[in-house]
């Protein structure tokens, strides 16, 4: 496998971290996931990711020189330097994801908001192929959104251009109760279903 070039893709979620090994033409070679360790405000998440990628490189007998880098989607605003300033779902405050991953893996790391990079992926290889303007909504532990305009991600003034999950939708409820994420995320649906079951509905 050393002659061909590869890259890794990582989607960090509040429940699980999904990873993929890709050939440099975008072909998926293998995918897997690991649980998201939220202990100690997510302090072990990046080292868990690095360890899993290193294990995969060893399993495949790959030379490190055959890996172009790793792309990482984070469920929160990310600035142009790959720094996350707050990520509620993971318990992170300001975290330099790019610098930390590059130090752990000795590989280039490219970091973006998860919904933004998902929207970009849909434009290149998914349901948005052939379109240069699109909006993508992601539903998981929270609700996210990615906006592509003229083929480019709309980042907004603070990296939260598509963060529709934090829109306040109900004026009579305090944050975060009035947020879209609170009302529509899969985690809220599970809580509501569990509450309904326990009350005999």
Locate each region found by the language model.
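Short glycine-rich, Thr/Ser-proximal phosphate-binding strand/loop in the N-terminal lobe
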Residues: 2-51, 83-85, 159
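Glycine/GP-enriched mid-protein hinge/lid loop-to-helix segment characteristic of carbohydrate kinases
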Residues: 2-4, 20-22, 30-32, 41-42, ...
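Short glycine-rich anion-binding loops that position phosphate/pyrophosphate groups of nucleotides
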Residues: 15, 75-77, 140-142
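Short glycine/serine/threonine-rich phosphate/pyrophosphate-binding segments
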Residues: 16-18, 117-119, 142-144
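Glycine-rich phosphate-binding loop and adjoining helix at the ATP-binding site
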Residues: 38, 42-51, 58, 65-70, ...
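A short alpha-helix-loop-beta-strand transition element characteristic
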Residues: 64-65, 156
